[in-house]
Structures are given as structure tokens and as C-alpha cells.
UniProtKB/Swiss-Prot annotation:
Disulfides per UniProt: none
Function (record text): Poorly processive, error-prone DNA polymerase involved in untargeted mutagenesis. Copies undamaged DNA at stalled replication forks, which arise in vivo from mismatched or misaligned primer ends. These misaligned primers can be extended by PolIV. Exhibits no 3'-5' exonuclease (proofreading) activity. May be involved in translesional synthesis, in conjunction with the beta clamp from PolIII.
Binding site for Mg(2+): 10, 105
Family listed: Belongs to the DNA polymerase type-Y family.
GO cellular component: cytosol; plasma membrane
Lineage of source species: Bacteria, Bacillati, Actinomycetota, Actinomycetes, Mycobacteriales
Organism: Mycobacterium tuberculosis (strain ATCC 25618 / H37Rv)
EC number(s) per entry: 2.7.7.7
Gene3D superfamilies linked to this entry: 3.30.70.270, 3.40.1170.60, 5' to 3' exonuclease, C-terminal subdomain (1.10.150.20), DNA polymerase, Y-family, little finger domain (3.30.1490.100)
Subcellular location: Cytoplasm
The name this protein goes by in its record: DNA polymerase IV 1
Length: 468
């Protein structure tokens, strides 16, 4: 009999899996979700794409090169992922009263009914939980279980894809000891490098240190905590998390930035990191803030507030770039950060995001940006791959391809099965922009959310790009 069981539920390839769920033709295809521009980054990759070596946070051009012409590249649909995530964890909460949600796609739980249970009973419960999520949403989860959060999270990683891994308490130390030290929660690239320089490659080697040695290497605060985790001591409680007020990312440069070209190149990468966290959080942002620390250590911040919350990368990044001052006027820049705030649930992304920005400039509040402008208006006849559309007879669909005066639409949703493709003139009046949520085909569930006016849980979202 074991005393405590913590579960870690992790949705498998969540962003790409939601795309394959709502666009059935993509099932079994190598799907990449992320930025489509030259500096785009992969936010999510299906397991079919991962088989080629593609992964999250990889430059999109590199992932496409690895996969070749069979790659399906789609822009993120944050509003769809948010509702899918909400339904997943509503389902989990039907079996477990307290869920500590870390992001869109993962959470801890400590079911009270498993206190003192044997491993076989835990396996049965985990399978019941996975089956309930799959039946309710059509999405696949992996579940790990152990005596604490650390072991549970490692176990869910070992269970992927589409599996369960229950680690008995007597097995935990043996499992931990042989793993790379980077697998320990809280060990980032900087700490990993410090440990490697001292010949400490595994969690077992870290556990063999004394408390004093761990504190000396990793710091007086974090060192002892990581040392305890390495020894399998993890009594952290599972608790509901409060919503973060801001999502941010920043980087300190070894050499100061002195030109607008350097600033533009740097902010694209930093904003991409912050945007990935925004997508995982599940809410949209209204306010974009750019933070700059000059070579004299003084700090300058500039911000702009849009009329509505959004997860649209194009709108957010364009505003961030336009907030940048010229280093020739203010001096060299040693640190640059991007923050998204004014976070709230989005039930529907604006169908003409850039146009809304242009038309509602008077409603936007700008700080320290006299004369700032917003993105140019969107041309409604220029369809993008991944756009959700509707046809009066064929129903809901998505743009599969566009160019040379025509647009190809695949008409399908989660409940339809693989659909047929139709080609139209690009200026056709037969198709119109549609809500991405219609692709989920959950009218009753989404309608109930609208009635409740409730918000989903979210994860803490502070990110330091400089330590990645």
C-alpha cells in the first residue's frame, strides 16, 4: 500500500492533435502549427511530424525542410485550443475535485480516492480518466503517477504517446538516478551547464551530493530544493493556480544593440517565445508592452492597448515592432523584453484583426508612442491557408490552399469525418469567414460556456528567453 499518489495528465501533441481532430483529413499527416513567416517558430508538431525530427520551438523553416513537401503547416488557432483545453479539464474535474492546471495541455491532480491505494488501483483510475477524456473530447492524453509532482511528470513523459506509467514508490529512486540531470524539474540550461562542468550528468549524481555542495553549486535557495527532488523527496501540494496577469519574455545581449535592424531581428524571436506562452495560457491579450534597458542601466517601457483581446501573432508582433525606438536616438540597448497583458478569455477571434485595429485606432490607448500606427487593413479577398470559412450549402470548412486566382476549401469538422475539397475563384461570394469554434462541432458545450461567461484556468507565464 502506498500513501500518496499524484497524477500528471499531459495531452499528446495538443495543438496539432486539435487540428487533426477538427480537420479530419489531417489525421495521420505530419502537421506543424506555428508562425508562417520567415522567422516563424513551431508551436506544436504532430507525432507524424516528430518522426521526421520536427519539434516545438524549432524554426519553422527547419521543420519544413526535415519533413519535405508532405508537411502541413497551419497558423495557431488559440480560441479553438482554449475551448478544447477547457473541455478536457472540465472532464478531469468531474473525477478529481482539485486540478492544478499548468497550461493548455497539462495538469496535476491528487485524487482523494487514491490515498493509500495500491499501484494496480491507480492504473485502473488512470485508464478510466484517459478514457473519459477521449470519449468527451476525442483527444488523447498520457498519464503518469507517483508519490509527488516530480515523479508524476517524469512518468507521463515516459508514458507518451497515448499511455499510462505508474511508478511504485519503491521504484522511484532507481528511476530517477539514471535520468539526465536536465530532466529534473527546475534544472535549466544554465544550471545544467554548471553541473556538467563538475561531471554531474545524472540525477543520481546530484542526489549523491551533500546539501552544502548542492547549495554551493546551484545557490542557497534553489540548490537544497533541487537536491531534495533529486533524492525523491517531493511533498509539494496540488493546488488550483491563480491566473497570471501578464505573459512576458526578455533577453539580455552579450553585445549592445545599436541599430533598428538588430532590434527588429531580436524582437521577433523574443515575441515568438512570449506568444507561445500566450497560446498555452489560453487567453487573448489586449496590451503589448516593450521593455528596453539601455547601456546606462536606465529602463524604458512603451505599450499599446488594442480594442479587443487576441492571440493573433501578426497583430501582436506588428504592434510590438512599431513600439521600438531608434537606438540612434536613445542609445545602445542591452536588454529587450515583450509583454502581453490585459488577458481575458476569447470566444471568437476577430475575423478581420488588422482591419479592426485600423478602424478603431481612436479606442486604443498608447503610452510613450506619439504618432504610433497600427497594422494595415486586411483584404478580405486574400484567403490564408488555415482560415475557417462557411458555405451556405456545404457548411463549415477551412482554406487548404490559395493562389493563382483560386482558393481551395476542405469542408469538414470534428463530427463530419474527412470532407471533400472544392475550388472557388478567390473573389467568390459563396464562402465567408466563419468562427473557428464551429470546427469543434460542440454547439451545446460552447453555448453553455457563453451562458456561464466563465474563464478557464491558466498557467504562470513569466519567461526569460535569456536563460533558454
Amino acid at each position: 500500500m502506498e500513501s500518496r499518489w499524484v497524477l500528471h495528465l499531459d495531452m499528446d501533441a495538443f495543438f496539432a492533435s486539435v487540428e487533426q481532430l477538427t480537420r479530419p483529413t489531417l489525421r495521420g499527416r505530419p502537421v506543424l502549427v506555428g508562425g508562417l513567416g520567415g522567422r516563424g517558430v513551431v508551436a506544436g508538431a504532430s507525432y507524424e511530424a516528430r518522426a521526421y525530427g520536427a519539434r516545438s520551438a524549432m524554426p519553422m523553416h527547419q521543420a519544413r525542410r526535415l519533413i519535405g513537401v508532405t508537411a502541413v503547416v497551419l497558423p495557431p488557432r488559440g480560441v479553438v485550443y482554449g475551448i478544447a483545453s477547457r473541455r478536457v479539464f472540465d472532464t478531469v474535474r468531474g473525477l478529481v475535485p482539485v486540478v492544478e492546471q499548468l497550461s493548455f495541455d497539462e495538469a496535476f491532480a491528487e485524487p482523494p480516492q487514491l490515498a493509500g491505494a495500491v499501484a494496480e488501483d491507480v492504473e485502473t483510475f488512470c485508464e478510466r480518466l484517459r478514457r473519459r477524456v477521449r470519449d468527451e473530447t476525442g483527444l488523447i492524453a498520457s498519464v503518469g503517477a507517483g508519490s509527488g509532482k516530480q515523479i508524476a511528470k517524469i512518468a507521463s513523459g515516459l508514458a507518451k504517446p497515448d499511455g499510462i506509467r505508474v511508478v511504485r514508490h519503491a521504484e522511484e529512486q532507481a528511476l530517477l538516478s539514471g535520468l539526465p540531470v536536465r530532466r529534473l524539474w527546475g534544472i535549466g540550461p544554465v544550471a545544467e551547464e554548471k553541473l556538467h562542468r563538475l561531471g554531474i550528468e545524472t540525477i543520481g549524481q546530484l542526489a549523491a551530493l551533500s546539501d552544502a555542495e548542492a547549495a554551493n553549486i546551484l545557490g542557497a535557495t534553489i540548490g537544497p530544493a533541487l537536491h531534495r527532488l533529486a533524492r525523491g523527496i517531493d511533498d509539494r501540494p496540488v493546488v488550483e493556480r491563480a491566473e497570471a496577469k501578464q505573459i512576458s519574455a526578455e533577453s539580455t545581449f552579450a553585445v549592445d544593440l545599436t541599430t533598428m535592424e538588430q532590434l527588429h531581428e531580436a524582437i521577433d524571436s523574443i515575441a515568438e517565445h512570449a506568444h507561445q506562452r500566450l497560446l498555452r495560457d489560453g487567453r487573448g491579450a489586449r496590451t503589448i508592452t516593450v521593455k528596453l534597458k539601455k547601456s546606462d542601466m536606465s529602463t524604458l517601457t512603451r505599450s499599446a492597448t488594442m480594442p479587443y483581446p487576441t492571440t493573433d501573432a501578426g497583430a501582436l508582433f506588428t504592434v510590438a515592432r512599431r513600439l521600438l525606438p531608434d537606438p540612434l536616438q536613445i542609445g545602445p540597448i542591452r536588454l529587450l523584453g515583450v509583454g502581453f497583458s490585459g488577458l481575458s478569455d476569447i470566444r471568437q477571434e476577430s475575423l478581420f484583426a488588422d482591419s479592426d485595429l485600423t478602424q478603431e485606432t481612436a479606442a486604443a490607448h498608447y503610452v510613450e508612442t506619439p504618432g504610433a500606427v497600427v497594422p494595415a487593413a486586411h483584404d478580405a479577398t486574400m484567403w490564408r491557408v488555415g482560415d475557417d470559412v462557411a458555405h451556405p450549402e456545404l457548411g463549415h470548412g477551412w482554406v487548404q490552399g490559395a493562389g493563382h486566382g483560386v482558393v481551395t476549401v476542405r469542408f469538414e469538422t470534428r463530427g463530419s469525418g474527412p470532407g471533400s475539397a472544392r475550388t472557388f475563384p478567390v473573389d467568390t461570394g459563396d464562402i465567408s469567414n466563419a468562427s473557428p469554434l464551429d470546427s469543434l462541432d460542440w454547439p451545446d458545450y460552447i453555448g453553455q460556456l457563453s451562458v456561464e461567461g466563465s474563464a478557464g484556468a491558466s498557467a504562470p507565464t513569466v519567461d526569460d528567453v535569456g536563460d533558454r
